[in-house]
Amino acid sequence: MSLFGVGFLAFAKGKRVCAIGRSSLGKISDPLEVPNLLDLQLDSFDWLIGGPRWRAALDAYRKNPSGAPIAEKSGLDEVFDEISPIEDSAGNMQLNFSKPVLEAEELSVRECRVRGRTYSAPLYVEAEFMNHDTGEIKTQTVFMGDFPLMTDKGTFVINGTERVVVSQLVRSPGVYFERTPEKNSEKDLFSGRIIPARGAWLEFEVDRHDQLGVRVDRKRRQPVIFFLRAIGMTDDEIRDAFGEFESISVQHEKNIGLSRDDALREIYRRVRPGEQASAEAGRALLENFYFTSRRFDLARVGRYKVNRKLGVDVDPTRMVLTRSDIIATIRYLAALHLGFSEVAVLNSNKSVPISTDDIDHLGNRRIRPVGELVQNQLRAGLARMERVVRERMTTQDIEAIIPQTLINVMPIVAALKEFYGTSQLSQFMDQNNPLAGLTHKRRLSALGPGGLSRERAGVEVRDVNPSHYGRMCPIETPEGPNIGLIGSLACYSRVNSFGFIETPYRRVVNGKVTDDIEYMTATQEDEHAIAQASTPLRPDNSFVDERVLVRRKGGEVEVVPADQVDYMDVSGRQMVSVATSLIPFLEHNDANRALMGSNMQRQAVPLLVTESPLVGTGMERYVAIDAGDVLIAEDPGIVGDVSADVVTVKQDDGKHRDYHVGKFVRSNQGNCYNQRVVVRSGDRVEKGTVLADGPCTDKGELSLGRNLLVAFMPWEGYNFEDAIIISQNLVKDDTLSSIHIEEHEVSTRDTKLGSEEITRDLPNVSMDYIKDLDERGIIRIGAEVGPGDILVGKVTPKGETELSAEERLLRAIFNEKSMEVRDTSLKVPHGQQGTVIDVKLFDAVDGEDKLGAGINQRVVVYIAHKRKITEGDKLAGRHGNKGVISKILPVEDMPFMADGTPVDIILNPLGVPARMNFGQVLETHLGWISKQGWKIEGDPDWAKDIRVREAQPDSRVSSPVFDGISEGEITGLFSSVFPNRDGERAVGSDGKAILYDGRTGEPFPEPISVGYMYVLKLHHLVDDKIHARSTGPYSMITQQPLGGKAQFGGQRFGEMEVWALEAYGAAHALQELLTIKSDDVVGRVKVYDAIVKGYPIPTPGVPESFKVIVKEMQSLCINIEVVSDGEDDVSADAETLQIEEGLDTSPKVEVGSLEEV
């Protein structure tokens, strides 16, 4: 067995098998394995289509009904049952749908990516048409369109690109009570509202005069007694239900003679002012608003919330309002207004506690995962289709009707296409690295349809709530306008069938911690006292201390006796997200820097050579495997044939399975996703064993950067303000080099003048330009290309005048095409270069490829470019410590240690204290210790909690978040590090070493902190940002150059820059900048001409912006004239001047976008 095989078997835990044996320096042993990090996406979509994961969960719930109930129907079954039956207006016909089935997909995920198609399966439904007059039933299996499928990585492939549907965080349906202080007095006003998943709101409120009112569908307020009468309550029923509440009794006595019909008319008048009010219209209005399932839907979660809050015992499957719901809501609000602590439930011997609701509490916010979002879109499509079906029922001959003739699937297909293609929640997948993709799938967004908007969202909804603990990460969120609106699911959390986030806890019985795990929602958790994971335990799992620190409702902390503790956290990393849990010594960092560290790990570029971190947190293997970018054995067996592209495994059941290895695939962000085989022929593999590493993985562990020898010291001012100095060795050895792949595409279409053509025969192009094109006119694989080089030769017909007979004869003799076609070849854009690594040709005429309307052929060319690290590139650590490379020093000039080892990177020590991210210093120290290896002699006090007594040089260690190694233990380990060959230790117990100046050989005056830090190269590369322009496009409106690299624009010389030149008196430079380099239209053409012909630069003219200010002043009735000492009319517009000068500006000045950047 090979070395790799031995390594894989050496470190296996659960379903994830890792080749790197990482020694944990944590004190807590986690009783619960980290769950599959993609469960949120996979489980939800599986419920939608009724897949095996949902069926297994349903079977398990039926055997042991605990926690939130699992939905009895799949999402597709639910939505087709809702729409059935569709009846015509007379009730003579009806159409029913049942048994939705997804057939096998047409193309594999890989083929869809290559061909630019959508990964989907045809959806069929059994449709049954019934004619009530004759009793005839016609049944057909009907095609309902192609239904996009989720890949096993939790993504969708739409038109060849990978997309992710982000889960939405919305307010849960239910009943809510809130207190708002009145503006002009110290009195508090109370209100209660019933919010459905779909339909009209019902709101009750107490005004400043202590009168209870109601708002129907958010319209005008009216006395609550009108509403009670309208729903059919008698005087006696009102007295029985509300006799104890004076505010309602007084209203009742005033309106004692009010009939139900009068109340209905009054309600209709207030909801529909201006229309003829009648009792029947009022009855229909209320029926449609609150008591009809087609118009009002509480949803399962809304019914659960209403029953739980009000204590009513309504059937959980009843999704409309009941009279008992309304009575209980009014009683609750009246009791809240009077300051009661609890209210009795009518017709029951129980009572419910009274409190107002915190709308930002996660017990009142729920997740709409991908399955529910797609189901809602399907529901909208079916509603549009329903209208078409009803219309066709009335227009078609009843005898000839079959289900197929009634159904038009276009509204359904359009609804799904619109959702996946344009919805705010269907996003282009972040494939910068595996962590970025995984985090994207676990993202929670409060934005989107039915959610908040970033302009209206206040501080409260963005802020961290105590209920976020263990459910939503308090650290990982964007820094810009979306801060707090977009979050990330915590490591151990899961979403229950109601959409509430649950987190696991260990049950504590009589002061003893058990291994029983219980998942709780934020509402359930509020009722218990919960200890933290780091609470010290004895070997028998009882608490060491008699009094234990616990967390209670609202995040309040108190110390209670051990026997009063109900639960305990399962892990120190329970409260944070996946990205944040990858930061070692997180507990020593300021939260702002931890946020930056979490976000910047997602920007790390996959490097040419991967290397796992010396100091990790233990989460690296979970992320690498669950992200889906490593190749994993699905069944145990023996590795057979191994090549760069395919690994064959002979499984224990006798079957041979081929695993295809991805080679140099372009990710959505233009990075190189490449897999490398890590097993050899003859190796034994188990289920879950890593067969091939993906991008940013090293032997099955996430590896985003490189371990570099770092020194914290200033060096000649080059690392001022976060700038970074690196060694030439990092460039020479490709330590931080990365490969980037660009995709270039061209299509041929049918035009009015004829078809475009891909060809090598291009007009007016020399052989030098087409030497690398093949006979088809497409670049050969392996060609080195630069800016302006032709990738695909293409000609387009152009219109021309009628030719004379002589011209036609000459053209026939010399076969000259240049006059009838123009060159529209695909060329390498400005600023790009590299090697052609792949070419794909899709043909709509000969092949089976489905291209767009009017497109005959499509060619895609992939160009790879290796980018070495260079000045201007951005580097970062995992602690929010980021900087730009300012200087690459020759290795001989770098500071070196006593044994001659030069450091790789020099950081400014002043970057640490102000940022308060001290974790980077501890990582540097522990990195040095693990690189050197250690052996603890004897039994010193500082080592009593360290389980790893000895580690070999270059060992990998983990310091879990909130459970890391202490500073005292690090200090002790420095004295246990293996010495060098001369018996000396290069770094002292304070983590510092004497460094020598590479230029002089003299030692620096003070010892310097030296160690190994994990450094990431971020996707902010200087090659993508550097830009220069000589001539280019101008804005049509201002006649000034466009802005930005994308528009090939100029560099803005703004107001303050002008002041600077004025201060220096640089009049000629300033005049040049404000005229011929900007918006002096005639002058810049003259200057271009003069430069080309070698003449002196002419005098600048008048810029367009000056003419604008003159016109503006004239428009303000200020008579301003420009007087010239010559004969020129200075105020004439540019076009007039061009005509007078006889200038043609078209070749030099392109009319660009109207947008100014």
Swiss-Prot record:
Catalyzed chemical reaction(s): RNA(n) + a ribonucleoside 5'-triphosphate = RNA(n+1) + diphosphate
Reported EC number(s) for this entry are 2.7.7.6
GO cellular component annotations of the record: DNA-directed RNA polymerase complex
What Gene3D superfamilies has UniProt attached to this entry? Answer: 2.40.50.100, 2.40.50.150, 3.90.1100.10, DNA-directed RNA polymerase, beta subunit, external 1 domain (2.30.150.10), DNA-directed RNA polymerase, subunit 2, domain 6 (2.40.270.10), RNA polymerase alpha subunit dimerisation domain (3.90.1800.10), RNA polymerase Rpb2, domain 2 (3.90.1110.10)
Recorded GO molecular functions are: DNA binding; DNA-directed RNA polymerase activity; ribonucleoside binding
Stored InterPro entries: DNA-dir_RNA_pol_bsu_ext_1_sf (IPR042107), DNA-dir_RNA_pol_bsu_external_1 (IPR019462), DNA-dir_RNA_pol_su2 (IPR015712), DNA-dir_RNAP_su2_dom (IPR007120), DNA-dir_RNAP_su2_hyb_sf (IPR037033), RNA_pol_bsu_bac (IPR010243), RNA_pol_bsu_CS (IPR007121), RNA_pol_bsu_protrusion (IPR007644)
Q: Which UniProt keywords apply?
A: DNA-directed RNA polymerase, Nucleotidyltransferase, Transcription, Transferase
| GO terms (BP aspect) | DNA-templated transcription
Pfam entry (one): RNA_pol_Rpb2_3
How does it associate, per the subunit comment?
Answer: The RNAP catalytic core consists of 2 alpha, 1 beta, 1 beta' and 1 omega subunit. When a sigma factor is associated with the core the holoenzyme is formed, which can initiate transcription.
According to its UniProt entry, the function of this protein is described as:
DNA-dependent RNA polymerase catalyzes the transcription of DNA into RNA using the four ribonucleoside triphosphates as substrates.
The family note in this entry says:
Belongs to the RNA polymerase beta chain family.
> What protein name does the entry list?
DNA-directed RNA polymerase subunit beta
